[in-house]
């Protein structure tokens, strides 16, 4: 496809991101940092929550409906000699659009795995980031961390600079071997022990890392410290390559300020998103056991000794039993909903599974019946999770209500 389109990716400076959890947050942090540094930034991400066009953004703005239609019709009219998937078409559209928009930097998030992901056809990126690796999509990627890590490591290519988030030893060994095979000259590993978590500042999380003191961020959740640091390291590596040999290179202080400012400004829909303080309603896209573990840690840290009403919608191919088990110590009860997807687990079956673990659960047909009444004050705390598709449905519903 790219060959028939004239290889638009060859005119782009790319940061390639893979990982089971956190890659969307790392992408969002990077986009914000680059925009603060004055670079025109394209971002390709998936899935979307409410609008398909969320997948293709420049400077934080979605591709227009007119450009989506124009580029979509162009792609659909071409004979590629193969049968592209929707994801293939979407990526091709993104690359054409980013080239037209003359982006200085493009952030590409893998859709699934790495080795055989469509984004891996885009040549050697300036920087490659591997976020947290855990168990998900095991029928496709493999049933051990080592197998899953090997798929993610398929995006590590000779000539790129590499950033790794901390990993289980089994996964890290595979990633380091891949870096060695590709003869990677620069590898930076996020060291969790070097992240100093500070008291919140003006309602924002705050931390220090290496030369950066008291960095603030709106993004909530304990796991976001590491995602933020991964983005900071990736940005430093990209700036080093991007400004090499250029005239009028910004001072180091200015770039460091852009990194701090970008981390502070970052917002990302559906990730530990506090929709309302009173009544308290938070939603998170945690959709596998590792994601729910991170959600649990964040809730315990941010709201110690609190119990929650959980709203859950999940896909049938997920390890929903383990996801439920993680949250049992924090749960008052569960409300379940069937997500609008062929892959969804029926809400009643999910409620049965929860009740079998000794926690009250009830299945509902309509979102309106499970969400808090936002017109009334309440001390109760409600958290929705289980699937990004489910969070997208809630966002669309709330926007309709507003």
Name what the model sees in each region:
Residues 1-49, 54, 127-129:
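Walker A (P-loop) phosphate-binding motif
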Residues 149-158:
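Membrane-proximal helix-turn-helix segments that form the acceptor-binding/catalytic region
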Residues 165-187, 203, 280-281, 289, ...:
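C-terminal helical cap/extension that packs against the catalytic core
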Residues 370-399:
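A glycine-rich beta-strand to alpha-helix segment
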Residues 47, 90-140, 172-214:
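Extended acidic/charged loop-beta regions that coordinate divalent cations
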Residues 11, 100-101, 105-110, 116-129, ...:
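Nucleotide phosphate-binding/pyrophosphate-handling subdomain across enzymes
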Residues 7-10, 36-123, 139-141, 169-170:
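ATP-dependent carboxylate-amine ligase catalytic core
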Residues 44-47, 165-166, 178-200, 217-222, ...:
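Beta-strand->loop->alpha-helix junctions that form or flank phosphate-binding loops
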């Amino acid at each position: 496809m790219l060959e028939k389109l004239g290889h638009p990716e060859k005119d782009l400076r790319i940061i390639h991101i893979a990982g089971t959890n956190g890659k969307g947050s790392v992408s969002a942090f990077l986009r914000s940092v680059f925009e603060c540094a004055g670079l025109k930034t394209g971002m390709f991400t998936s899935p979307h929550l409410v609008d398909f066009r969320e997948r293709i953004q420049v400077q934080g703005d979605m591709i227009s409906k007119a450009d989506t239609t124009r580029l979509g019709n162009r792609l659909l009219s071409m004979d590629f000699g193969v049968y592209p998937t929707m994801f293939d078409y979407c990526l091709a559209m993104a690359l054409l659009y980013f080239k037209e928009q003359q982006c200085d930097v493009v952030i590409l998030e893998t859709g699934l795995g790495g080795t055989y992901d469509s984004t891996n056809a885009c040549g050697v990126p300036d920087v490659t980031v591997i976020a947290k690796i855990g168990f998900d999509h095991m029928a496709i990627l493999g049933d051990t961390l080592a197998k899953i890590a090997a798929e993610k490591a398929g995006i590590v290519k000779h000539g790129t600079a590499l950033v790794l988030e901390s990993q289980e030893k089994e996964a890290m060994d595979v990633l380091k071997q891949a870096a060695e095979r590709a003869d990677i000259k620069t590898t930076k590993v996020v060291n969790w022990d070097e992240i100093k978590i500070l008291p919140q500042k003006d309602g924002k999380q705050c931390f220090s890392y290496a030369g950066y003191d008291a960095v603030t961020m709106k993004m909530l959740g304990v796991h976001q410290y590491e995602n933020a640091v991964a983005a900071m390291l990736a940005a430093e590596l990209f700036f080093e390559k991007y400004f090499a040999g250029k005239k009028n290179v910004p001072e180091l202080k200015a770039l460091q300020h852009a990194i701090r400012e970008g981390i502070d400004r970052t917002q990302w829909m559906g990730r530990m998103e506090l929709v309302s303080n009173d009544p308290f309603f938070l939603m998170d896209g945690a959709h596998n056991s590792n994601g729910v573990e991170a959600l649990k840690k964040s809730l315990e840290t941010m709201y110690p000794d609190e119990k929650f009403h959980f709203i859950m919608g999940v896909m049938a191919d997920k390890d929903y039993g383990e996801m439920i088990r993680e949250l049992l110590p924090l749960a008052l009860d569960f409300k379940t909903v069937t997500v609008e997807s062929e892959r969804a687990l029926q809400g009643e079956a999910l409620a049965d599974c929860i009740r079998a673990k000794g926690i009250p659960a009830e299945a509902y047909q309509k979102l309106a019946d499970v969400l808090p009444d936002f017109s009334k004050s309440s001390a109760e705390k409600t958290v929705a999770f289980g699937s990004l598709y489910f969070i997208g449905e809630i966002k669309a519903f709330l926007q309709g209500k507003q």
